[in-house]
From Swiss-Prot:
It is found in: Cytoplasm. The keyword Cytoplasm applies. This is Phosphoheptose isomerase. GO terms for biological process: carbohydrate metabolic process; D-glycero-D-manno-heptose 7-phosphate biosynthetic process. InterPro entries: GmhA/DiaA, Phosphoheptose_Isoase, SIS_dom, SIS_dom_sf, SIS_GmhA/DiaA_subfam. The gene is gmhA. Catalyzes the isomerization of sedoheptulose 7-phosphate in D-glycero-D-manno-heptose 7-phosphate. Coiled coil: none annotated. Homotetramer.
Amino acid sequence: MTTVAIQTYFQELRDVVDRVGREKVDQIRQSVQLLTACLRCGGKVLIMGNGGSAADAQHFAAELVGRFLMERKALPSIALTTDTSILTAVGNDYGFDEIFKRQIEALADPRDVVIGLSTSGMSNNVFHALTAANQVGCKTIGLLGREGGSIASIVDVNLTVPEHHTPYIQTAHGAVLHLFCDLLEKELFTPSGQTE
C-alpha cells in the first residue's frame, strides 16, 4: 500500500463527486422540489435498492424519520429493503424481480415519491417497482450509475452518476442523499422555505 495509491483513490473519488456537483444541479433541484411537494401534501417517500444501495436506502429513510441536522418533526419515509418476511415471502412466491413491486402496489399513493437506487441502472426489481409506481401516479427518481441503464427512461428525474466504478457511484449517491436531507430540512423547517 503506497501513499500514491491512497491519494489517487481520493482524487478519483473527488473528481466523481465534483462532476455530479457541476453536471447534475438541475436533477438535484428537481428531485428536492418533488420531495418537498410530496412531504408538504401528506405524501411519503418510498426508497429501494440492492446490496450497498439497499443500505443507502435505509440510511436515507432513517435520516428522514429521525433527523439529519435539525431538530424537527419526523418525515414519512419507508425503505422497502427492511422487512425480511415480506422480501422472502414475495421472493419465494413471485420471484426476486417482484420484491419491491408488490410493496409499491400495497403501500404507494399518488402523493408519494418513489426513489430507486441502482449503480448499473439495470436492476430488474427496481425497474419493475418504478414502473408500478408510475402506474399508481407517484413521482419517481432514479439514482443511477454508468449510462443510466433501462431505469433512466422510466423515471421523472434521472440522476445518473456518470461513472463505471461502483464504489465511487455509491459514495456519490450517499452524498446526493445527504444533500437531499439538508435541502429538505431547509425547505420544510426554516422561515425562508416554510409554508406552514
